From Swiss-Prot:
Keywords: ATP synthesis, Cell inner membrane, Cell membrane, CF(0), Hydrogen ion transport, Ion transport, Membrane, Transmembrane, Transmembrane helix, Transport
Species annotation: Endomicrobium trichonymphae
Entry's Gene Ontology cellular component terms: plasma membrane; proton-transporting ATP synthase complex
InterPro entries named among the record's database cross-references: ATP_synth_b/b'su_bac/chlpt, ATP_synth_F0_bsu_bac, ATP_synthase_B_chain
Gene: atpF
Membrane spanning residue stretches: 13-33
Protein name (Swiss-Prot/TrEMBL): ATP synthase subunit b
Length: 169
């Protein structure tokens, strides 16, 4: 104890200071350190949660970017397929229209040929009738002086028959 007294320490005073120190430590621990630790722990938890959310957002962004690329690739592929289908359809439609136009033009040409042939035949018949009439008149004038009436009739009928045969052939 002598050593303690040499340093100037008094046991009672030291004991009171020790009790005061323990009371202050208890009060600080109870009312300051506990709430402060709680606030710091809550802040640490929020920071960790924010970091985790940021990491999740980064992963979600990467996934969205990949999905976007996949969707764009599918859309491009679909558009290319659709364009190819449209081109084929247009080509088929064009070819079909050309074929139909050719068939229609051939049909029109055939109809025109038939009409021309019918018209030609009709004109030939008319010309034949006119030539028979003219021939008959010419023959009756020419033959009127040379032959009798019955001979003229026979000759005329034979001549007209031959002309009719020539026209029909």
């Amino acid at each position: 104890m002598e050593i303690i007294q040499k340093f100037g320490l008094e046991a009672k005073l030291f004991l009171f200071q020790l009790i005061n120190f323990l009371i202050i430590v208890f009060i600080l621990k109870k009312f300051l350190f506990a709430p402060l630790k709680k606030i710091l722990d809550e802040r640490k938890r929020k920071i960790e949660q924010s970091l985790q959310d940021a990491e999740n957002a980064k992963i979600a962004l990467e996934n969205a970017s990949e999905k976007k690329k996949n969707i764009l690739a599918k859309a491009k592929s679909s558009a290319d397929t659709l364009m190819a289908t449209v081109k084929v359809s247009i080509k088929e439609t064009k070819e079909k229209a050309v074929i139909e136009a050719k068939q229609r033009s051939e049909q029109i040409i055939d109809e025109a040929k038939q009409k021309a042939a019918t018209e030609f035949e009709s004109m030939n018949k008319k010309i034949g009738k006119i030539s028979v009439d003219i021939s008959g008149k010419v023959m009756s004038k020419v033959l009127s002086d040379l032959f009798t009436e019955t001979e003229k009739q026979k000759l005329m009928s034979r001549a007209l028959e031959k002309i009719d045969e020539n026209i029909k052939n």
